[in-house]
């Protein structure tokens, strides 16, 4: 489940693809057929600097975030792979722009309850994400309380988990509050961190015989430790 360069042109930049692993495929099809398996994070922010949530600053932040976490700008396509059935495609050019009306939405609300109702509908109603749109952010400015903003980050579970999104959210607010920078992270280096979970298994390159041996040794060690615990109990 590693990335492969499949294209490079002036219009798209470099284009990379990789198959989804088993976990990602499960979330992918769960989202398509059941409309679930998406994550919505809701944060309440008070600011004294009105420019923080202007469209230009939020768009700049989202572009920078996609360049750090490139799966935010990926698309998913079903393939003929026998073991996975789908693949991610990341085009370098897509990470440097915002698709109008899709990735960033600036809205207004008159109460906190109104935003909570929106988030509930986002989770329980018709799915707002798709294989072509794996992430988006909604910014609600409170008309009844100037300076108060709700940030709702909506991401497909196939590209992130509950712990990973905490890092992403922290990075989002860091970029939002800092001056612009011209630094663009190396795409290949960032994609190297977005591999399938199977690639993180230290035993994946071992032969079947070696894996069985490792499993047997692990079972023996576990039983010895378990026996010691039982003996030490009063």
Spans of features found by a protein language model:
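Flexible, P/S/T/G-rich "lid" or insertion loops adjacent to the active sites of thioester-utilizing
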Residues: 214-234
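Non-catalytic N-terminal regions of enzymes
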Residues: 1-203
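Phosphate/pyrophosphate-binding loops and the adjoining catalytic core of nucleotide-dependent enzymes
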Residues: 209-212
């Amino acid at each position: 489940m590693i990335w492969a360069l499949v294209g490079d042109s002036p219009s798209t930049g470099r284009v990379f693809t990789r198959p989804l692993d088993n976990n990602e495929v499960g979330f992918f099809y769960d989202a398509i057929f059941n409309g679930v398996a998406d994550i919505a994070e809701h944060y309440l922010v008070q600011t004294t600097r009105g420019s923080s949530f202007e469209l230009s600053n939020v768009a700049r932040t989202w572009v920078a975030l996609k360049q750090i976490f490139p799966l935010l700008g990926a698309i998913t396509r079903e393939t003929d792979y026998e073991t996975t059935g789908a693949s991610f495609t990341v085009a370098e050019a897509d990470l440097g722009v915002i698709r109008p009306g899709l990735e960033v939405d600036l809205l207004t609300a008159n109460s906190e309850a109104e935003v909570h109702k929106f988030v509930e509908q986002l989770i329980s109603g018709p799915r707002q994400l798709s294989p072509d749109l794996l992430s988006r952010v909604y910014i609600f400015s409170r008309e009844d309380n100037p300076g108060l903003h709700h940030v709702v980050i909506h991401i497909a579970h196939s590209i992130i988990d509950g712990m990973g999104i905490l890092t992403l959210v922290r990075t989002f607010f860091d970029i939002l509050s800092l001056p612009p920078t011209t630094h663009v992270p190396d795409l290949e280096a960032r994609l190297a961190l977005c591999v399938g979970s199977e690639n993180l298994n230290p035993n994946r390159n071992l032969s079947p015989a070696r894996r069985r041996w490792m499993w047997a040794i692990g079972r023996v060690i576990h039983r010895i430790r378990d026996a010691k615990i039982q003996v030490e109990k009063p």
